[in-house]
Structure formats: C-alpha cells, structure tokens
C-alpha cells in the first residue's frame, strides 16, 4: 500500500508541477547549509552551483529521453544554464572538455550552437569553434542545430567567430576524413560548411576539398562503401557472401576500419567473415587503437552482451575474450585507493536503461581493482558479494537493476563499518521519504568516528545533489577520464574545474 501511495505521489507531481532549479553561484562564501531545491522525483536535494550543473549535464547527457526528463528538455536546460553563467570562457572550455576528453557529441553540439549569441566581442571565440571540433561532422551538426534554433533559415547569418573557427578546424583533417564525413545524406552537408566558412586548403586536404566542392568526391575506403560495393557487384548469393567476406578481410587486414565501427560490426564479421575473426580480435586488443578511439567504456559492455547472444562456438568465445581484454586495457588508470572503500549502486526504477548499465559497469571496475565492499540500494540497501578474481563483465552481471524507490537514507543506515570513502553511483533522484540523507550521513560519521570522502557520481545529469556540495566530490560522465579526476580529488577538491580551466583559448 505504501509503495502504491508513493507512486501516486510521483504521478501527481508530474502532472501538477514543473521542474524547478534553484541554482547557487559557484565558490560562494560557505554557509551552514546549501540551498534546498526539489529534484525531479519530488524529494529534497541540494542545488548544484550553475557551473557544476552545467558540467554534470555536459558529461552525462546523450540528449535522449531519460526517466525524469526528455532530450528536448535537456537542451532547454542547457541553454538556460549557459546564459546564467557569467564566465563565458568557463562555459566554452567545459564544452571543449566534454567533447575532446569525454567524447560527448550531441550535447556539446547544442551548447556550441547556443554560444553563438553569447560570445560576441570575445577574441577567443574563433579558437573555441576550432577546438570544439574533433571530427568533420561536428561542424555539420553544430550548423544544423544553429539553423534550426538560432537564425532565420531563409536569410541565415553566421557569426564570424564560428566561420573563422570552423575554417581553421579543417586543417586537422585529411582527404580520407573529409570523404568519410561528407554527410551527403544529411540536410546540412560538409560541402555546405565549406561554402560558408571558406577554409584554406592544405596539402593534407586540398584534393578532397576541391572534389567536394565540385561534387566529385567519392569515398571507397570506408566499411560502408566496401560492403555497398560488394552488394552492387554480386551476381548471386554465393558471390555476395564471398565478396562481403573479402571486404571485411581487407578492411581489417589494412586497418582501414575505425575502432568503433569494428566494435559495432563484430556480429557481422563473425557471420560474414569468420576467417577474419582472429585478425579482428588482434585489432580489438591493440592498446594504441583503444586509447586513440575515444570509445566509452560502456560500449564494450554493450558489444559483449550482443555477442554473448550468438552462441558458444570458438569464434564467439574468442571475440568475447578480446572484448574483455580491451575493456581492461581501456581502464588501466582506475585508481587504487588506500584504506576501506564502499561502492554504492542505485538500482531503483529511475535507473533503468543506460544509467543502470553504467552504474553496474563502473561499480564492477572499481570493485575489481580495489577489492572493496559493494552495496546496492533502492527501497532498502544491501551488501553484495562478488569474486574480485572474476572478469569485470562477470562481476557486473551480479549488480543488476531491480527497480523500486530511491532511498538514500538506507545506505548509511546499512553501512556497518568505518569507510575512508564512499563512491555513490546514481541518477541522484532520492524521493523515498522526501528528505535528503544528510541526517543519516551525519549519524553514520558520529557512530564510527569517521569523515569519509564521498564521490557523488551523477549518471544522468539531472542537476541536484543528495549532499551539500562542500561535503562531497561531485563527479559526472561515462569516460574513464573520470578516474583521472578521482586520483586528484582527495588532494584537490576542485580538480574537475581545474582540468577544465586549464584549457587554453587565447
């Protein structure tokens, strides 16, 4: 009956109330308590500073619908936050950091487009629009958002900073990259960007730019082009099968397939080019390719789950082993902490989907490396057992989403020993009881005579914290770069902000 009433309360909340953010300025004078706000589940939470809320959103949002909010709402919140922050250089650097270090695309495209009206008069604006571009299609996506939301399509006006920055950004790309990201099937094509910004050709891209402008640029080297050519030239099914096998084999042996494309096409390679599986596995575990790929750790978990569905023959087993090894390589910088550590994972209803996948993966990684205690919580909290000698994926499998409410109080009511640090993986929406767990946290500290570091890891970027900011290190993001920041946190409380501010724009 209690759970039914709680669910009814949430439904009433969604119908009757709009989202309210009460943001506090970053680095204000410390007071006895932070500003209380209401989180998206209707419970109490502490508001983040505007800067921290922005960074959290940038590092966690893939601009898709979440349990408590839609992708369009996220973009509106992003615009509002960027306008509230007076330090525009920090906003710009945060966008670059999220795109370059964490591989976040759509959310940074939206922010870059919104900043066109906020960077007037800043000499470093052109440098921002250069540095926020990592791939050629970053420019087409930013322009697409800009045309849809920030200018009159019939008479579009493009800021000089954007045009100069994009023109310079073309210097990063060679003929292959330009031909790969022509975006010829999109409303905004790469040739449109060229015609708007007029980049100066270099030896790396002169031929491709010339062919692109004259609509003669063809890309025959990508995996899509190779497979398409096989389909067009095959005379029968047997011929098609051989041509596809040859195409995959050539792409893999010549290393002309991107790492992410390789990861996404492992199922096709197993089915269509079994002779190339061994070479594909060698690419998968190549340490240099993994580091350059910018593939987020949860992508390995997704690939592992998909391949696991294919059965148990040798090719499948070999690929699963390679994915496991690649995941381990991608996380060599996971910190080993001194003392006792508790990893706490939210398995409540709001964590369904990607947040749950991320929490279980990163929880397993931290647990394996640190041999620490693990707890899951929803309506209540419970300790979980695991074997640290198992693989990350095996450990992860035991930390599954279960649904239910989000009772943060239960964590510290259940904690039964002194911990030096607590790592909390959650979407930070604590509605059970409608109060923050600050009292329970204080009681825990008093009971065990301890003042632990608390790493509050926001997996959804909803904008509220379950503890006052000064009592925790607020983390966000899905990249293994978060672990680099964690290494600094116990020394430098503002490590994340320092990383962002260190980016050079002028």
Regions found by a protein language model. Name each.
Residues 2-12:
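Intrinsically disordered, low-complexity segments enriched in serine/proline and basic residues
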Residues 13-14, 21:
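Aromatic (phenylalanine/tyrosine) cluster motif
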Residues 23-354, 368-506:
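Long lumenal/extracellular ectodomains of secretory and single-pass membrane proteins
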Residues 356-360:
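Short, conserved loop/turn and helix-capping segments at secondary-structure boundaries
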């Amino acid at each position: 009956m209690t759970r039914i009433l709680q669910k009814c309360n949430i439904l009433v909340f969604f119908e009757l109330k709009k989202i309210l953010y009460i943001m506090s300025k970053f680095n204000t004078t410390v007071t006895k308590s932070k500003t209380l706000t209401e989180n998206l589940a209707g419970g109490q939470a502490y508001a983040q500073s505007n800067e921290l809320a922005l960074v959290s959103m940038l590092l966690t949002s893939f601009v898709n619908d979440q349990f408590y909010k839609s992708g369009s709402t996220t973009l509106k919140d992003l615009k509002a936050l960027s306008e509230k922050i007076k330090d525009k250089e920090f906003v710009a650097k945060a966008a670059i950091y999220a795109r370059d270090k964490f591989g976040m695309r759509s959310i940074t495209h939206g922010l870059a487009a919104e900043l066109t009206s906020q960077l007037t008069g800043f000499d470093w604006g052109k440098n921002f629009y250069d540095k926020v571009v990592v791939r050629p299609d970053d420019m087409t996506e930013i322009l697409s958002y800009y045309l849809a939301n920030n200018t009159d399509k019939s008479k579009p006006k493009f800021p000089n900073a954007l045009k100069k920055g994009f023109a310079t950004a073309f210097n990063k790309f060679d003929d292959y990259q330009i031909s790969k990201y022509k975006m010829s099937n999109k409303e905004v094509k790469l040739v449109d960007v060229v015609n708007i910004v007029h980049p100066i050709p270099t030896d790396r891209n002169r031929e491709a730019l010339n062919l692109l402008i004259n609509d003669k640029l063809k890309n025959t080297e990508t995996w899509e082009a190779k497979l398409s050519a096989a389909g067009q030239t095959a005379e029968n099914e047997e011929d098609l099968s051989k041509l596809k096998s040859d195409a995959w084999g050539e792409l893999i042996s010549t290393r002309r397939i991107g790492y992410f494309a390789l990861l996404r096409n492992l199922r096709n390679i197993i089915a269509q080019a079994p002779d190339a599986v061994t070479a594909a596995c060698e690419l998968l575990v190549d340490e240099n390719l993994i580091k350059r790929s910018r593939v987020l750790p949860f992508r390995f978990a997704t690939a592992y789950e998909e391949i696991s569905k294919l059965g148990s023959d040798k090719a499948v087993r070999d690929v699963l082993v390679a994915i496991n090894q690649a995941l381990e390589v991608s996380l060599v910088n996971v910190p080993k902490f001194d003392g006792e550590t508790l990893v706490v994972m939210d398995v409540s209803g709001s964590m369904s989907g990607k947040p749950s996948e991320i929490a279980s993966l990163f929880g397993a990684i931290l647990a394996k490396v640190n041999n620490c205690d693990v707890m899951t919580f929803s309506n209540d909290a419970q300790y979980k057992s695991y074997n640290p000698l198992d693989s990350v994926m095996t450990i992860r499998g035991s930390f599954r989403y279960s649904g239910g409410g989000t009772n943060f109080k239960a964590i510290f009511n259940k904690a039964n020993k002194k911990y030096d640090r607590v790592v909390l993986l959650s979407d930070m929406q604590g509605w059970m009881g409608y109060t923050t767990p600050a009292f329970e946290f204080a009681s825990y500290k008093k009971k065990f005579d301890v003042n632990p570091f608390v790493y509050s890891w926001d997996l959804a970027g909803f904008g509220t914290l379950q503890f006052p900011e000064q009592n925790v290190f607020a983390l966000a993001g899905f990249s293994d770069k978060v672990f680099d920041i964690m290494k600094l946190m116990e020394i430098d409380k503002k490590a994340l902000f320092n990383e962002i501010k260190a980016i050079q724009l002028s």
